[in-house]
Amino acid sequence: MRLGQLLKDTTFDVAYTSALKRTHQTLDALLKGAEITTLPTIHAAELNERDYGTLTGSNKWEVKDQIGEEAFNGIRRGWDYPVPDGETLKDVYARVVPYFETEILPRLQDGENVLLVAHGNSIRALMKHLDHVPEADMAHVEMPFGQLLVYTFEPTSDLPTNKDVLSVEIEAVNA
């Protein structure tokens, strides 16, 4: 809710979330903190978290113990590290960026303020695109808890003209 207070002075035209309940709950908390009572919202599966395939639902620390640190870091932070029956970050990029370009970017270019609530990996994929991050550097791209990224777009620009980071201290929950 404290993070939402950083948005009090912003008028949003629309919100986008993934189709997963966690982002709906986060959006509700942000809107409450910003004292926004209604906002048109679009739920899009293209913004969903990475599919971890056979690892979905597993405790990440148990997985790390089972597969070792190198494979664990490859899965969590690698660009094209395979997961059995799941997605790589490259796969997430391949669905998030086209959705952004066709659905969200035109609104930004029309001067709308868009609130996007997504997951760590879908945001990391979008950051790769917006911030021109090379594949080799993706392991170091983080979206920490308690931060909002604010990208500014001009009507003729396909990429942001400015990026700000807003943050509050939030105690991370061990997930």
Question: Predicted regions: what is each one?
Answer:
Residues T10, Q66, G78, D110-G111:
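Structured helix-beta-strand junction loops
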Residues K32-V97, E142:
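Phosphate-handling substructures
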Residues T23-T26, R50-G53, P82-V83, I123-L126:
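Short catalytic/ligand-binding loop motif for oxyanion handling, primarily in non-cytosolic enzymes
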Residues T10-E46, A71-N73, L130-D131, T152-A175:
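Conserved histidine-centered catalytic loops in small-molecule metabolism enzymes
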Residues T17-L20, E46, R77, E112-N113, ...:
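Short, well-ordered beta-to-alpha junction loops that form the rim of enzyme active sites
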Residues M1-T38, Q66, P84-V96, A139, ...:
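Active-site-proximal alpha-helix that buttresses catalytic centers in soluble enzyme cores
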Residues H24, P98-L159:
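Active-site-adjacent alpha-helix immediately C-terminal to a catalytic or transition-state-stabilizing loop
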